A protein has these predicted regions:
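Serine-hydrolase catalytic machinery in alpha/beta-hydrolase-like enzymes
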Residues: 2-74, 85, 89
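The conserved beta1-alpha1 loop
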Residues: 6-10, 107, 135
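Acidic beta-to-alpha connecting loop that harbors the catalytic carboxylate
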Residues: 11, 137-139, 165-167
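Conserved alpha/beta-hydrolase "acid-adjacent" motif
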Residues: 16, 140-146
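Primarily recognizes the serine-hydrolase "nucleophile elbow" in alpha/beta-hydrolase
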Residues: 57-126
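Short beta-strand/loop motif that positions the catalytic acidic residue
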Residues: 127-128, 133-135, 139
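Catalytic histidine-centered segment of alpha/beta-hydrolase-like enzymes
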Residues: 166-176
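C-terminal alpha-helix
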Residues: 180-188
Length: 188
C-alpha cells in the first residue's frame, strides 16, 4: 500500500504548479510532498546539472519517508517534465538506486522540442519499478509514437495515458491528470 507521494516540478515552474496542487488535493488525505529543486530555492532560473537534481530527489524522498515513518518502498515519486525525468533517473541509478513503489511522469521530456534525435532514454532499461506516464497527444517533447518506442525499453510495460489534444504543459487538464494518478495508485 502506498503511504505517500513526492512530487517535483518541471524546469520552468515551482512546487506550486497547478498540476501538482491538483494532485495533492485529489489524493488527500494521503500525504503528498511537493518539492522545489535547489536552483529554484536559490532564485535561479536555470536548473542545476542532472546529478545535483537526482541527489535532491533521493535526499527529499528519503527524508519524507523518515518524516512519515515508512520506507521509501512505500512511496510513489514523480513530477512534471524534468521533475519526473529526474525521478526516473534516481530510481534507476546504477550506484545508488532509490527504491520506491512507483514513479509517475507527467509530460516526460523524451527529447528537446524539434530535436527528436536527442533522446533522453539511456537510463530507461534500468527503471525497474511500476511506472505511469501521462502525456498529451500534441506534446512537443515526444509524440505518442516516439514515447511508445521509448517505453519499450523499460524492463516491464508501464501504464501510459495520452490526453487527446494536450500539449506538453497539459493546460486545462490538471484534474484529469490528478484522477489518472489516483486511479493508477490503486494498482501499485
Amino acid at each position: 500500500m502506498v503511504r505517500g507521494v513526492v512530487l517535483f516540478p518541471g524546469a520552468g515552474s515551482s512546487r506550486d504548479h497547478a498540476a501538482l496542487l491538483a494532485i495533492e488535493k485529489e489524493l488527500s488525505p494521503l500525504p503528498v510532498l511537493r518539492v522545489d529543486f535547489p536552483y529554484r530555492k536559490a532564485g535561479k532560473k536555470f536548473p542545476d546539472k542532472a546529478p545535483v537534481l537526482v541527489q535532491c530527489v533521493k535526499d527529499e524522498v528519503r527524508a519524507f519517508a523518515r518524516e512519515i515513518g515508512c520506507d521509501t518502498t512505500d512511496l510513489v515519486i514523480g513530477g512534471r517534465s524534468m521533475g519526473g525525468r529526474m525521478c526516473t533517473m534516481a530510481s534507476s541509478d546504477i550506484e545508488d538506486a532509490l527504491l520506491i513503489a512507483g514513479v509517475v511522469c507527467i509530460g516526460y521530456p523524451l527529447h528537446p522540442p524539434k530535436k527528436p534525435e536527442q533522446l533522453r532514454t539511456e537510463h530507461l532499461p534500468r527503471l525497474a519499478t511500476k511506472a505511469l506516464f501521462i502525456s498529451g497527444t500534441r506534446d512537443e517533447f515526444g509524440t505518442p509514437e516516439e514515447l511508445e518506442t521509448a517505453f519499450a525499453l523499460l524492463p516491464s510495460p508501464p501504464a501510459v495515458q495520452f490526453i487527446e489534444g494536450g500539449r506538453h504543459e497539459l493546460k486545462g487538464h490538471d484534474e484529469r491528470v490528478a484522477t489518472l494518478l489516483k486511479d493508477w495508485l490503486r494498482t501499485v
